[in-house]
Amino acid sequence: MKFQYKEVHPFEYRKKEGEKIRKKYPDRVPLIVEKAPKARVPDLDRRKYLVPSDLTDGQFYLLIRKRIHLRPEDALFFFVNNTIPPTSATMGQLYEDSHEEDDFLYVAYSNESVYGK
């Protein structure tokens, strides 16, 4: 997926910002969260998040559901590197496994369980 944040901000800017955040908040994970293409769910009010590294994917899922005002019966899926992460994984584990060279972890969300549909 092409993240709009990457399109708008050059790599050098993102890298500098990511390093600054990680240095200032070593126990937190910097995230870029964007809606997947063709997803039929509301947009988030912001893209950048700084979450505790011990927050689970499941807890973050609930936070995002609340921010986009999804009804209980509406589906929501996260993708990290085009795969759905386990809800028991901590954001710190996901960050260590999947963060990009700019020191951000990129997360896409969608109402479909198949990436890009």
Swiss-Prot record:
Q: Where is this site: Cleavage?
A: 116-117
Gene Ontology MF: a single term: phosphatidylethanolamine binding
Q: Where in the cell is it found?
A: Cytoplasm, Cytoskeleton; Cytoplasmic vesicle, Autophagosome membrane
Example GO biological process? autophagosome assembly
Modification(s) after translation: The precursor molecule is cleaved by ATG4B to form the cytosolic form, GABARAPL3-I. This is activated by APG7L/ATG7, transferred to ATG3 and conjugated to phospholipid to form the membrane-bound form, GABARAPL3-II. ATG4B also mediates the delipidation required for GABARAPL1 recycling when autophagosomes fuse with lysosomes.
The record describes its membrane topology as: Lipid-anchor
User: What Pfam families does the record tag this protein with?
Assistant: ATG8 (PF02991)
What's one GO-annotated cellular component?
microtubule
Region of interest (Interaction with GABRG2), ranges: 36-68
Query: Which residues are assigned to the propeptide feature?
Result: 117
TM spans (from-to): none
- Region called Interaction with beta-tubulin, residue ranges: 1-22
Indicate yes or no for the key word Isomerase.
no
Query: Which InterPro entries does the UniProt entry name for this protein?
Result: Atg8-like, Ubiquitin-like_domsf
Keyword line: Autophagy, Cytoplasm, Cytoplasmic vesicle, Cytoskeleton, Lipoprotein, Membrane, Microtubule
Per the record, lipidation of type Phosphatidylethanolamine amidated glycine is found at 116
What is the tissue localization of expression for this protein? Ubiquitous. Expressed at very high levels in the brain, heart, peripheral blood leukocytes, liver, kidney, placenta and skeletal muscle. Expressed at very low levels in thymus and small intestine.
Q: Does the keyword Isomerase apply?
A: no
Q: How does it assemble?
A: Interacts with GABRG2 and beta-tubulin.
What is this protein's function per UniProt?
Ubiquitin-like modifier involved in autophagosome formation. Whereas LC3s are involved in elongation of the phagophore membrane, the GABARAP/GATE-16 subfamily is essential for a later stage in autophagosome maturation.
Q: Which family does it belong to?
A: Belongs to the ATG8 family.
The protein's name in its UniProt record: Gamma-aminobutyric acid receptor-associated protein-like 3
Its ancestry begins with: Eukaryota, Metazoa, Chordata, Craniata, Vertebrata
Gene that specifies this protein:
GABARAPL3
